[in-house]
């Protein structure tokens, strides 16, 4: 039976949601009974990391195989069985990805607001333990104000929103929102492709490092 390679972002405790509670582990096969149905029932995954990130509720990045009865959508799929091949903790990686997406967006704006630039700087300091959560929250507030101030100029607003998103303290949330904001007013498909390749390269490098 053909197995489909896919990605899944697991909760930080590596437990399945929706009151299931089973633990995701490398090498373990998890299965469901009945007919899989997208968003309702089945072992889910996405063919690309960015699509998987859109459904993330945690920062544990899982490389998986899905098979059995399979229900396919444009951005995700679900099947009867899912085997986790390997897992990496993507917390710091996703924070850095969010910062890079925000920097891409700011690079397209004339005269980037210093509050947005500072939000990215503080985020990187916070990841390294050199800034407090209070300082990160203050940087997020300032980036939010910059986004509001730029709201009348759509091109600038996308850049400011990306910087604000990068300052989130939840890694998966920051990465997802920054990626969306950065691609919003750029040539969308091209920006999305660049971000997809970047995230794939970062995850591949981290997986090799963690071996």
Where are these regions (language model features)?
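Short, glycine-biased loop/turn motifs at secondary-structure junctions and
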Residues: 1-211
């Amino acid at each position: 039976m053909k197995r489909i390679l896919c990605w899944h972002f697991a909760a930080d405790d590596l437990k399945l949601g929706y009151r299931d509670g089973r633990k995701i582990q490398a090498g373990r096969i998890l299965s469901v009974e009945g007919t899989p149905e997208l968003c309702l029932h089945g072992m889910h995954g996405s063919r690309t990391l960015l699509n998987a990130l859109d459904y993330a509720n945690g920062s544990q990045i899982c490389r998986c195989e899905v098979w059995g009865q399979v229900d396919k959508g444009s951005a995700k799929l679900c099947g009867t069985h899912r085997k986790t091949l390997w897992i990496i903790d993507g917390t710091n990686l996703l924070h850095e990805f969010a910062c890079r997406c925000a920097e891409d967006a700011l690079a397209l704006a004339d005269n980037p607001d210093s509050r947005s630039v500072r939000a990215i700087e503080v985020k990187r300091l916070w990841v390294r333990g050199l800034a407090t959560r209070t300082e990160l929250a203050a940087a997020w507030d300032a980036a939010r104000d910059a986004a509001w101030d730029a709201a009348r100029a759509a091109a600038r607003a996308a850049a400011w929103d990306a910087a604000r998103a990068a300052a989130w303290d939840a890694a998966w949330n920051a990465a997802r929102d920054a990626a969306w904001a950065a691609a919003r007013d750029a040539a969308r498909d091209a920006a999305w492709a660049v971000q997809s390749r970047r995230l794939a390269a970062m995850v591949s490098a981290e997986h090799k490092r963690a071996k």
